[in-house]
Amino acid sequence: MTRTILIASGKGGVGKTTLTSNLAYALTQLGENVIAVDANLTTPNLGLHFGMHLAPRTLQDVLKGKIRLDKAMYTHPYGFRFIPASISTRDLAGVDVGRLQNVMLGLTGKADYVLMDCAAGLGREATSAIAAADEILLVTNPDLPSVADALKAAEVARGMNKDIIGVVVNRTKGKRHELGIGAIRELLEVPVIAQIPEDRMVAESIAAKRPIMDYASDSPAAVEILKLAAKLSGRRLKASSTNVSVLRRLINWMRR
């Protein structure tokens, strides 16, 4: 069964694209068949994270009816497949975002996981992505503006009868001014399923166009993303460690 999961936030800059790219890698490392989709048509960045931002055929071409969906799908060297969006504003002309839901149905049965990144905010582009997904994974930073926007996204998703599987609290620093996990859970009325700490290695990995789990697999953020991927796939970690050799052994064990 294919799980189509939209990584959504309501607010830009909280790290949902970074999380999407790293989950695609992590789930693939765990032996899952993954397709990542950049459904952010106006300001796409997922291709930049993957080093595949100059693809000749994109989701915009599919939404214009120019090509079939499979013609805009590429296999990344890390093993997952990727459907990019064009970074050129000229390619927005003639795009029918209302077709996104039907287009995404074409991926049913072709992967274990379809991970969608989408535009920030709650405009038609973002709501079309919500409509096209089966499940929603919220991402927020531990501050009130981020959580408030995540709440708006949650309300839209609930209005469409979408299953919100949880919220990821990203870039935590352990500071007194941050909203606590209990407060975030109470405000959003969804479980907090991961806390990813602020980690300077994440910015370095983005610049290198490599997932943090590949670039610095022993970093705190990489370990938490692996835990999240394991939780999404229903796997249980035997142990937890920031030691790279132990982390690799965990991945190898879970792929059996």
Where does each model-flagged region fall?
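Walker A/P-loop phosphate-binding motif and the immediately C-terminal alpha-helix
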Residues: 3-39
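NTP-binding/hydrolysis catalytic cores, primarily Walker-type P-loop NTPases
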Residues: 212-256
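P-loop/Walker-type NTP enzyme "switch/lid" segment
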Residues: 36-109, 206-208, 214
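Conserved catalytic-core segment of NTP-binding enzymes
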Residues: 102, 106-109, 113-204, 208
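Generic secondary-structure signature for well-ordered alpha-helical cores
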Residues: 29-32, 109, 113, 189, ...
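Residue-level signature of catalytic and energy-coupling elements of molecular machines
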Residues: 12, 17, 38, 62, ...
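Short, conserved catalytic or interaction motifs in soluble domains
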Residues: 9, 29-32, 39, 85, ...
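Conserved beta-strand scaffold positions in the cores of enzyme catalytic domains, especially
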Residues: 4, 82, 192-195
